[in-house]
Each structure stands twice: as C-alpha cells, then as structure tokens.
Amino acid sequence: MLFSISVLAQTKLDSLLPVRGFCIDAPRPAGLDSFIHFIDSELAPRKVNTLVVQIEYHFQFQTHPELTDSFALSKADVRKIVSACKKNNIRVIPQINLLGHQSWANRTGKLLKVYPQFDETPDIKMPVIYAWPNSDNLYCRSYCPLYPELHQVLFAVIDELCDAFESNAFHAGMDEVFFIGYDKCPRCGGRDKAELFAGEVTTIHDHLVLKGREMWIWGDRLLDGKTTGLGEWEASFNNTYRAIDMIPKDLVICDWHYDRA
C-alpha cells in the first residue's frame, strides 16, 4: 500500500513538474566526492530529475587537448557523476557556453585563447582592470559564428563531452550575447543580428539532432528587452529577439531571470 501511494505521488509530481532542474558549475577534481554527496543528499531527496553541469572546458578532451582548461575532470571523474545521477534517476546534461560568454571580466576564455582567430571583435582589447560600463561596451567576448573552421572544433568537443556524460541532450548556453554582427567583422558586419543568432542556433541544433540529442539554450536573447522592460542582460537590446520565429521548435528554451522565475 505504501509503495502504491509513493508511486502515485511520484506520477502526480511528474505530471505537474516534468522538469525539476538544477544548474551548477563543474566541480574541481578534488571536490568530486563532495559533488557526488551533494547529488545524493541534496538533489535526490528534493526530487530533482535534471542536472545541468556547466563544464565549459574543464574536461580532459582527447579530440582537442589544447582546449583543456586549468582544472579538468577526467573520463573516470565524469563516470562517477553519471553513475550518481543514474542511481537517483537524474538526467545529466553537460553545458559549454557557445557564441557569447567567451570571456569574463579581464580574462579571455579558453576557446579564444587557443583560437584567437575565432574572435568576433579582435580589435577590442581586454582591459587590465575591468569596469562596466566601458567605452567598448565589452561585457563578454563572442566568437564569430561564420568563421570557417569554428564548428569543426566545437562539434568535436561537444560530441566528446556528450559521449562521456552518456547524455541525450546538450546545453549550449547562448545567453547575454552582446557582440554579434559586429560592424568591423569581415564576415558578420552589416548582417541581421537576429538571423545570425538564429543561424548559429540552427547549426548547432542540426548537428545535435544528427547525433540523436536535444538542444537546450538560455532564453534571454529571444526576449525584447525594450518592450518587456527586462533590460539588456535578461533580454535583448540588439534585436536578436526576432530569432524566436527563425529557430527550430524542438529545442528547449530555459527562461531565467535575476529576480523572477
């Protein structure tokens, strides 16, 4: 009888909240045991069933070892995370921030450090001391979505990461993209920013679909920051919001806000 009630309660919860998700940065290898304990003791009892892990380049890539960042999880480390998630019926989804968030403050991210030719705004220099606002409107750097060799690199690391996590989905980030369609970019300059954003979403989506995987993204670039009053972080001030009508309809859009959910 108790088992029947438990199953009924779980079924009702699944119907009301089919995705009960949590997003967190990747642990350092030294903190892996604590991370596993967190899954077992905090996420599982709260009935979390989806875990997005922001890996970025903190993985020991074999396809592109040059992209492995300062602290990096091994395949064996990832297997422990996957095992803990399976045990607790949690779907685990790895994330690498694509398009935007290729830098933070005065530090360039791993992709553009290794492949500076991918930079959308190479003429804008990183400040010694970062401050916002600034004359360059530099929040975070972006890669150029039209650079010829870009996706060959991205697809290799995405596939390797998803394989390691045994995941049927990938979170591409794509939030807070300020630099897109930069006037001085020989490939993107003068192009419609919404079309560029939609084109990059579609390119990544189509690759994932070929691999049998679902694409997840953050939703802020698909909201009009001016009409909604949400501002330029939680929504778009550079007209990418029109991409909502141009992107595939079978991807998952994660709506986030600083003060509202």
Where is each model-derived feature located?
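Aromatic-lined carbohydrate-binding surfaces of glycoside hydrolases
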Residues: C23-L251
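Catalytic beta/alpha-barrel core
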Residues: C254-H257
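Flexible, acidic glycine-rich loops studded with aromatic residues
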Residues: A261
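Transmembrane beta-strand segments of Gram-negative outer membrane beta-barrel proteins
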Residues: V19-G21
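Bacterial Sec-dependent N-terminal signal peptides
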Residues: M1-K12
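Contiguous, structured surface segment used for ligand recognition
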Residues: Q10-L17, A26
